[in-house]
Amino acid sequence: MYNMYYCKRNKYISNYSFGKNNKGHITIKHRQGLFIKSSQLKNTNYNYIFKKNIFNIINYNNKKIIKLQILKKIIDYKLQKYIYKVICLNNSLNYQYKYLPITKNTKEGDIIYIGETIELKIGNILPIKKIPCGSWIHNIEHNPTKGAVFVKNSKISAFLIYIGKKYVTIKLPSGEIRLLNKNVFCILGELNIIPLFLKKNKAGFNRLLGKRPKVRGVAMNACDHPHGGGEGKNSIGRSSVYSPWGTISKGIITRKSKKYSKKLILKNRKKND
């Protein structure tokens, strides 16, 4: 059906640095080159509704509608799950391929729309202010035109609680209740991820995914790790667990106390005791 068109593939141009900097020094441990370069879930920003300068908010067109069609399920080896491969049916996008998470009650061959003036249908992508309260949503943006951040890879979707003048209130799968800008885009419906259940029957499978072996700190020398050194199997010898750089890695708050989005969080997430 699509042989008559030139389908521009949305290729994955990898900026994978193998865990090293420009001098060849290791900056990220347990990382190596990729062999399986699968199509990852990278099309998380809904900039299809913009003109050529997609990052310029002045060029926003409210009446523009993008039409997508689901082609097939494909395997994402990196995330180890299935995702949908869709094609844009608008001439302005040159029939590009995109990738989206799987929504419940959608199947291959369905038509999906993106825009502000579209109907409320499961799988459609529209502003969160157009969705009625009490709906399930996923693949949600944090700021308009910046790409989806929330609820991308979990099996439970977010719940829309209230729509106000400037902000909307949602409940995330972690139990956190927070405010969001009402102009952000999201996907209507519940997220349905079908895992692959891949059996990693050998260590070489992880090596193909770009993962190197991990060595315990207790098994290292004292010059390589704070847990290292000693004769035979010794304990850590410290009151807490430390990172390779000598900082405590348990119970330390890493979030900034004066972060700008702190005022948008109404209820913190449930922490494991």
From Swiss-Prot:
Main location class: plastid
Superkingdom of this protein's organism: Eukaryota
Pfam families: Ribosomal_L2_C (PF03947)
GO MF entries: RNA binding; structural constituent of ribosome; transferase activity
Record-linked Gene3D superfamilies: 2.30.30.30, Ribosomal protein L2, domain 3
Any GO BP annotation: mitochondrial translation
Listed GO CC annotations: apicoplast; mitochondrial large ribosomal subunit
Claim: 4Fe-4S is one of the keywords in the record: no
Quaternary structure annotation from Swiss-Prot or TrEMBL: Part of the 50S ribosomal subunit.
The family this protein is said to belong to: Belongs to the universal ribosomal protein uL2 family.
The protein's name: Large ribosomal subunit protein uL2c
Species annotation: Eimeria tenella
Gene: rpl2
